[in-house]
Amino acid sequence: MSQSRDLQGGKAFGLLKAQQEERLEGINKQFLDDPKYSNDEDLPSKLEAFKVKYMEFDLNGNGDIDIMSLKRMLEKLGVPKTHLELKRLIREVSSGSEETFSYSDFLRMMLGKRSAILRMILMYEEKNKEHKRPTGPPAKKAISELP
């Protein structure tokens, strides 16, 4: 990101996200061409969904998700973790750094055998979005129905 303190955000943020999306599309293409993942059914739509989720939490557009982004993601999902648990999770996922993980690491985890944790997180988030609150006044309850 640029060194200047331009706090505007609209157009610059849009350009940053467009560049980030192009970069992630290139990585998706590498995974589509990789014979290791050729047996994975519906791979293009999975990669697209993973790209959207990754972009949602990589707000600064630097290509890596750090501890604070992961913490925000898990808190948003209602599964807060301690700092040590977050470090351990990132260490399991990342191929190099202990403080961040890249989109490639994220895809390897999602498409590999260790994807159960993150798949569960993403599935939980989707279920949370589908649940709509009832509209209108609440139903009347009798005293016998109260706990």
From Swiss-Prot:
UniProt cross-references to SUPFAM superfamilies, sorted A to Z: EF-hand (SSF47473)
Location of the protein in the cell: Cytoplasm, Cytoskeleton; Cell projection, Ruffle membrane; Cell projection, Phagocytic cup
Domain EF-hand: 45-80, 81-115
Post-translational modification N6-acetyllysine, affected residues: 11
A single GO molecular function term of this UniProt record: calcium ion binding
Subcellular location, principal: cytoplasm
Keywords: Acetylation, Actin-binding, Calcium, Cell membrane, Cell projection, Cytoplasm, Cytoskeleton, Membrane, Metal-binding, Phosphoprotein, Repeat
Binding site for Ca(2+) 2: 98, 100, 105
GO process annotations (BP): actin crosslink formation; actin filament bundle assembly; actin filament polymerization; cellular response to oxidative stress; cellular response to type II interferon; inflammatory response; microglial cell activation; negative regulation of smooth muscle cell chemotaxis
Keyword Acetylation: yes
Binding sites annotated in the UniProt record for Ca(2+) 1: 58, 60, 62, 64
Residue(s) carrying N-acetylserine: 2
InterPro entries assigned to the protein according to its UniProt record, in alphabetical order: AIF-1_EF_pair (IPR049025), AIF1/AIF1L (IPR042433), EF-hand-dom_pair (IPR011992), EF_hand_dom (IPR002048)
Domain of life: Eukaryota
Record's comment on post-translational modification: Phosphorylated on serine residues.
Pfam families attached to this UniProt entry: AIF-1
Role according to the record: Actin-binding protein that enhances membrane ruffling and RAC activation. Enhances the actin-bundling activity of LCP1. Binds calcium. Plays a role in RAC signaling and in phagocytosis. May play a role in macrophage activation and function. Promotes the proliferation of vascular smooth muscle cells and of T-lymphocytes. Enhances lymphocyte migration. Plays a role in vascular inflammation.
Protein name, UniProt field: Allograft inflammatory factor 1
Organism: Mus musculus
